[in-house]
């Protein structure tokens, strides 16, 4: 008998819910069954973020740095305006109605500017004014924080100089703790950044030290982001095939907590086994080289 020659098995949310209910000895009978299962699935994704590194959720972000600005969003944060051409990079903008302020880190198009985390909340239709250029324009849509808030953590970062040129070079920068950062006595020292601290707020912030002393730097970092939500039963899930068994087992366990308490222990054991197997496979396979020490030593008798 011929094989299918297809490798596109990709269950949607509804199929995972049906599988989970069947493992609980149940069937999906009502609309509320779908709702409660979808909620459990999103909570399961949140649990995976706490359990460790999910490599398919790593993405790279590049942020142009601005002289004398040390704090940046841990992702892409933009504002859509009527016209951006008269504003200058590095200047502070102020909302005429809200009084909110932010600094411009780049002008990405004729109607979009990238900004730092605002102090206050800009509102749609208000007028913003540039502190240096005195340019004015209208905010056409509220600032969307979704991209920045999807950041779970920062894994590594480099400072790139002369991006795109033949002389492009990357210099790694080290991550420091909150305690180390707060004890830096001269946070406004200008230099090429050599360290960063991740302030893990709901809207996470990257704090650099030293404060950039030129506009030729680009901050390039790898970040761990949230798995896409399971919103619609017809949606597929943002999970690679190697995690399909783990997802089905985990959802069955979560549903059993509410609807099949007699199966909780069994389904939990299956889920933990499936997760351990999937996590072990989802690892970095870089070569490891061990070099014996050549240090001299003295044998004491």
Give residue ranges: language-model regions.
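Glycine-enriched, solvent-exposed interface loops adjoining structured elements
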Residues: 1-76, 138-301
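Autoprocessing Asn-cyclization modules and mimics
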Residues: 52-143
